[in-house]
A protein has these predicted regions:
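Gram-negative outer-membrane beta-barrel transporters
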Residues: 3, 385-393, 401-402, 501-502, ...
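Acidic, small-polar-rich N-terminal luminal/periplasmic segments of exported/outer-membrane proteins
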Residues: 34-165, 180, 491, 672
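Periplasmic-side early beta-strands and strand-to-turn transitions of outer-membrane beta-barrels
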Residues: 116, 142, 155-157, 163-165, ...
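Transmembrane beta-strands of outer-membrane beta-barrel pores
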Residues: 158, 174-178, 192-194, 203-207, ...
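Outer-membrane beta-barrel signature, preferentially recognizing the C-terminal barrel domain
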Residues: 170, 257-282, 320-325, 372-374, ...
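Flexible loop and strand-edge segments within Gram-negative outer membrane beta-barrel domains
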Residues: 206, 212-213, 219, 237-284, ...
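Signature of Gram-negative outer-membrane beta-barrel scaffolds
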Residues: 213, 341-446, 458, 469-471
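C-terminal beta-signal and adjacent terminal beta-strands/loops
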Residues: 510-512, 599-608, 632-689
Length: 689
């Protein structure tokens, strides 16, 4: 498959200009002991901060250099992988689990994508570098952050700025790289002891990349986001904040029949927090949010309609879908010596609608049609016994009432529209979740834990409304697909010493009524069916970092996931293969240098024709290994320049979790996985004031 693209540009003036600007501002910076500093030079892998919890700074440079969305950031945490669409907007997978099994929150709000095939998954609307912290909880080991998080929870968080005197804080970065990669991020906060104004913005763009064979892979993108927050802090324990944000993007997808011509985001939120309340009552928190995703897919903005494709794709066409989600949460914390209690309520309401048109931009004149409405309310509590001691029991319980209404009056098919047999029907379900975990500190720096968790998940929009068919005997997926129930055991060991840090975690679970997609045929004529099966999952992750003499560090991580379909006695689809990362880093007072080897084995445990709403197993995949180098220079504790080369030897390879390339771009009719980028150069400057 051959394509042409415009030559790569240098784009080198941007980091130089930013570097000169921020260097000039150093003359007016705060004293060194008050400065906000940059710590790690380049992140190649993340380690847990506590049992099953990962916390990392998304603004630090990462290798391989991530795309503009959140999926590539998550891949530095062992156990995460992603399904590639093109150059950006990959769909995250944790331990082989996909979709709403992974609860993704931005500033404690839920922004759900609108595309029936998840071309705009939730991470498509999140700009990671505009957040202060990325927190990950693996497994069903928390009930605080919503229902159904059987695989885990991902939170992109912003801190509350506090000022002792009037001042200004800033975070800025610029990135340039191969295929005209060009990113800028600016986050400014102006405040005093009684309040603040915070404004953040980012833009990101890149052209189509070339794989290791030199072939162009359709993958270009352009993105921007902007957010502003105004906070009132009358004292050190009180916060009232209102915020608003917007964004948009375009993205070319090698593995889709259409591209993303619009990713419009509109967000509003408010939050209140009061700490150090009298007596045992310590904290009260509340937040409300409104998020809307307005997404346009077409086959003419970023490509030319393919005259050889099946109807109706030879002619220009577009689909406009919209998802509005609004919700809120109230929680309180109580402390009694070594006992901590958290209790609260939360809920959300979501509406999905769409319109489409044949011909360029004719969809704009079409009327909106609502097809689904979701609603959920829940109560939760978490209890910690032995908080602050060397033996801790942590438990949680959650109960949710979920409902969904089918608003479709008719269902589109290859032979035209037909009446919907479930029009106006509503499904209601009670969902229960809970966990119990024991943690013990055995010696200095050594901790082990074991936890048992259970999660019940309501089928999401993509599982109820996207499939062409439901289980055998059901009129459609809306009536036939049942809630998914996961029971999982997590165990692990962590050690943090002066020179050695090591950790290992393992899990085994049983999933009743796992929601499985089966595909019959391919292309526009292909049909999908959603059904429930019983499944088993298991796996492990491990990491090691050793500090040697001479400021050297050696590290490595390992991740493995396994799944089995008990009903059909075959592998569970979309399971990533065994992956290892080995790193060597040298870090001096100002300079650092590092190397990263990533090795992935073949995957022969496949279930061809089965998967999820986005992807299916395309057959066995080959193993591969890539090598990357990085270097960084710290001008001061606040200013840093880093650079690197990914896929140094220009290897041609593809990931197991993948889409088949679209025939519109010259990919063969037989499914062929999309190759990863070839050799890529990048340079990034970070400034923090």
């Amino acid at each position: 498959m051959k394509m042409t693209s415009r030559p790569a540009g240098a784009c080198a003036r941007l980091p130089v200009a930013l570097g000169l600007a921020v260097a000039a501002s150093l003359a007016h910076a705060a004293p060194a002991d008050e400065a906000r500093t940059l710590d790690t030079m380049v992140v190649t892998a993340a380690a847990p901060s506590s049992p099953l919890h990962w916390v990392t700074d998304p603004r630090l440079p990462r290798q391989p250099v991530p795309a503009s969305d959140g999926a590539d950031y998550l891949k530095t945490v062992p156990g995460f992988s992603a399904i590639r669409n093109g150059g950006t907007n990959g769909d995250p997978v944790l331990r082989g689990m996909f979709g709403s099994r992974l609860n993704i929150l931005s500033n404690d709000g839920n922004l759900i994508g609108a595309c029936p095939s998840r071309m705009d998954n939730p991470l498509s609307y999140i700009a990671p570098e505009s957040f202060d912290r990325l927190t990950i909880i693996k497994g069903p080991q928390s009930v605080r952050w919503g229902a159904g998080a059987s695989a885990g929870t991902v939170r992109f968080e912003r801190d509350t700025p506090r000022f002792d005197e009037p001042g200004l804080r800033a975070d800025a970065s610029a990135l340039v790289g191969s295929r005209n990669r060009n990113d800028q991020v600016l986050d400014l906060t102006l405040g005093n002891p009684t309040g603040y104004v915070r404004a953040s913005g980012n833009r990101s763009e890149a052209d189509d990349y070339k794989d290791g064979h030199g072939d162009v892979v359709p993958s270009k993108w352009r993105k921007w986001n902007g957010d502003v927050a105004i906070g009132w802090t009358p004292d050190a324990d009180t916060l009232l904040e209102i915020s608003a944000g917007a964004g948009d993007a375009i993205a070319r997808y090698a593995g889709r029949g259409m591209d993303g011509a619009a990713f419009e985001r509109t967000s509003y939120a408010a939050r209140f927090e009061k700490r150090n309340l009298p007596g045992a009552w310590d904290t009260l928190q509340a937040n409300v949010y409104y998020n809307e995703a307005d997404h346009v897919m077409d086959n003419y903005t970023l490509r030319t309609p393919n005259p050889n494709s099946m109807m109706p794709m030879p002619m220009p066409m577009a689909s406009n879908v919209d998802r509005r989600t609004q919700g809120g949460r109230v929680s309180s914390e109580w402390h009694w010596q070594d006992v901590q209690l958290v209790a609260g309520v939360d809920g959300e309401d979501s509406r999905h609608r769409g319109r489409m048109g044949m011909g360029r931009d004719t969809y704009r004149q079409a009327a909106w049609e609502t097809d689904a409405k979701f609603r959920r309310y829940g109560v939760f509590t978490e209890l910690t016994l032995g908080a602050g001691t060397d033996q801790r029991w942590i438990s949680g319980l959650r109960i949710d009432r979920a409902s969904v209404r089918d608003e479709r009056q008719s269902i589109r098919g290859m032979m035209g529209n037909r009446p919907n047999p479930t029009a106006g029907q509503r499904r209601k379900e009670w969902l229960g979740s809970g966990f119990l975990r024991y943690e013990q500190d055995l010696a200095d720096g050594l901790t082990w834990y074991a936890g048992l968790g259970h999660s019940e998940r309501m089928p999401d929009y993509w599982e109820l409304f996207s499939p062409n068919h439901g289980p055998a005997g059901a009129v459609n997926a809306f009536t036939g697909v049942q809630p998914e129930r996961t029971t999982q055991l997590d165990v692990g060991l962590q050690y943090k010493g002066p020179r050695v840090q090591a950790w290992v975690s393992a899990y085994a679970g049983q999933i009743q009524d796992y929601i499985l997609f089966t595909y019959h045929g391919s292309g526009m004529m292909g049909m999908s069916q959603a059904r429930n099966v019983d499944a088993r999952i298991a796996g492990a992750e491990a990491g090691l970092e050793v500090s040697l003499a001479g400021q050297w560090k050696l590290g490595g991580t390992l991740a493995y996931a396994w799944g089995g379909n008990r009903d059909q006695q075959r592998p569970l689809p979309q399971m990533p293969p065994l992956e290892a990362r080995l790193s060597a880093n040298w870090e001096g007072q100002r300079w650092s240098a590092g190397a990263l080897l990533r090795a992935v084995t073949h995957q022969h445990r496949v279930a061809e024709g089965q998967g999820n709403v986005v992807a299916q197993d395309l057959g066995p995949s080959a193993g591969f290994a890539t090598f990357a180098l990085n270097a960084a220079y710290r001008f001061s504790s606040q200013l840093q320049l880093s650079a690197g080369v990914d896929n140094l030897f220009d290897r041609a390879y593809s990931e197991h979790l993948n889409l088949a390339g679209s025939a519109d771009f010259g990919f063969p009719a037989d499914p062929e996985r999309i190759n990863e980028p070839g050799r890529s150069l990048w340079m990034k400057v970070n400034y923090r004031y």
